């Protein structure tokens, strides 16, 4: 947008933010081919996204939306998100599934408002379309979308422009609502979003002195923001809520050890002065079952945080101590017991779906002599297990294809128990590398050096067994910090959006530190 000296819009030229990286020309075709099995299931109604679509179409019919136009724009959203890498196989939070959830909750809530709060049909359409595309940033550098880039992609999509026009709404208003979903809506982010929103109001023909209309759309944007923040937590149980929180943590930048604490703060923010009234409007317009889900999940995070505080206090008072134990899988006389296996599986279920298709493979690997299994225990090497790390030869961790967990809307390998599809390692087949799966620690014991202890013991055991390299996935920031501290670690393959990169540690250069325990 071109602004004159008086800060007034003088041209309809759009606000351009260039994406950081251009994807290869073949990428969309590759994604379409790879997602063909998923598309087949989607088209016959066997995916979670298809279920959301059906519910949205049912609501839209009651609101006298054009059924064909609604169906087309949903299909376009699903197609665009999927072929740009934000579909069912994307490990982050801001997926097409999330956008469909927000669209569904927005429609449901808007249609159930009391007479005094009734939302006009045109505004409901604005809400719906903005909800569908509010996270559409396929070339983002970070997991969290950039609203300026979202605007760019939406404006450059001619087909979407025609679909939006068929709803009889203004594209500029839709984009203004999307800018209001910026989170957290504070500081420089808030200033930037508000400035752009008012520019868009002017592009939509709303005069500068028409304060009431501008304020009306600001409130509508806040309504969308509330729906965005609570949608997923209204639609599932606490296991689903924990999965959403873990995914969302990556986008917002929370460390895994503060997820419960930050989740409590996240939900408490809905009760703050600026958001409280709108939150009450939204939550009380939803069915009882959805309200119960939401408040049960909020209480679940609060109880988990309180339990965390109790455990951390005991650890810091030295009432309990953490120790690591190498489970002797190689010794036939001392293989892990069924009780130990069940406890490890229980901890694993805090990170993966209990209906995980790979349960059998995981259990089998626990009894494999090539597996390294380190447990984190309380007080002694025979104490209660509160965490573990496991891994094995790289060759036994090849990508798993074609399986997708509909209940949680994620790949079962989301906990990084195998190589991600698309990861290429030059050492695969050389039998010189061991893959370390993600560390799993029970809620409450995170952040008390347990993860460091498990990782250190795993690296030492890998070197003792003659491996040259340890590979795994981690957040880019953590990899960089370790490298800066002198660890012989390198990023082998970057994943720009989620920033969960594949790395390699050279064990020949690894200097053993003094054991913490």
Outline where the language-model segments fall.
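Short amphipathic alpha-helix that is part of the acyltransferase structural core
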Residues: 58-59, 317-361, 368, 374-385
């Amino acid at each position: 947008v071109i602004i004159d000296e008086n800060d007034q819009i003088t041209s309809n030229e759009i606000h351009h933010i260039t994406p950081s990286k251009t994807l290869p020309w073949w990428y969309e075709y590759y994604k379409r081919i790879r997602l063909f099995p998923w598309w087949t299931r989607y088209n016959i109604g066997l995916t979670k996204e298809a279920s959301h679509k059906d519910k949205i179409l049912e609501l839209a019919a009651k609101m006298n939306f054009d059924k064909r136009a609604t169906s087309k724009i949903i299909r376009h959203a699903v197609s665009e998100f999927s072929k740009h890498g934000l579909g069912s196989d994307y490990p982050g939070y801001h997926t097409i599934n999330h956008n469909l959830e927000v669209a569904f909750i927005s429609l449901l809530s808007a249609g159930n408002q009391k007479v005094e709060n009734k939302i006009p049909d045109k505004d409901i359409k604005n809400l719906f379309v903005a909800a569908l595309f509010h996270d559409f940033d396929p070339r983002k550098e970070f997991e969290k979308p950039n609203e300026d880039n979202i605007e760019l992609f939406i404006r450059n999509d001619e087909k979407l422009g025609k679909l939006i026009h068929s709803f009889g709404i203004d594209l500029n208003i839709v984009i203004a609502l999307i800018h209001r979903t910026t989170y957290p809506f504070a500081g420089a982010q808030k200033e930037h979003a508000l400035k752009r929103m008012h520019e868009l109001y002017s592009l939509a023909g709303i005069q500068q002195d028409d304060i009431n209309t501008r304020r009306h759309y600001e409130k509508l944007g806040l309504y969308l923001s509330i729906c965005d923040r609570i949608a997923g937590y209204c639609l599932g149980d606490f296991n689903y809520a924990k999965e959403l929180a873990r995914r969302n943590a990556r986008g917002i930048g929370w460390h895994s050890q503060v997820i419960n604490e930050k989740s409590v703060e996240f939900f408490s923010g809905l009760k703050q002065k600026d958001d409280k009234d709108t939150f009450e409007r939204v939550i009380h317009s939803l069915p009882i079952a959805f309200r119960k889900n939401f408040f049960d999940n909020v209480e679940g995070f609060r109880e988990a945080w309180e339990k965390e505080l109790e455990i951390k206090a005991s650890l810091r008072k030295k009432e309990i101590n953490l120790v690591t134990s190498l489970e002797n899988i190689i010794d036939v006389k001392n293989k892990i017991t069924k009780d130990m296996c069940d406890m490890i599986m229980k901890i694993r279920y805090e990170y993966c779906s209990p209906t995980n298709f790979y349960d059998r493979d995981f259990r089998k690997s626990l009894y494999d002599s090539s597996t390294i299994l380190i447990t984190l225990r309380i007080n002694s090497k025979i104490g209660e297990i509160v965490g573990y790390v496991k891994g094995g030869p790289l060759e036994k961790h090849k990508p798993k294809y074609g399986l997708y967990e509909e209940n949680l809307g994620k790949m079962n390998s989301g906990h990084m128990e195998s190589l991600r599809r698309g990861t290429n390692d030059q050492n695969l087949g050389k039998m010189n590398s061991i893959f370390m799966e993600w560390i799993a620690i029970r809620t409450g014991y995170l952040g008390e050096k347990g993860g460091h202890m498990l990782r250190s013991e795993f690296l030492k055991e890998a070197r003792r067994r003659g491996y040259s390299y340890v590979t795994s996935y981690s957040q880019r920031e953590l990899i960089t910090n370790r490298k800066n501290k002198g660890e012989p670690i390198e990023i082998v393959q970057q994943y720009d959006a989620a920033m969960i990169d594949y790395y390699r540690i050279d064990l020949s250069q690894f200097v053993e530190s003094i054991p913490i325990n």
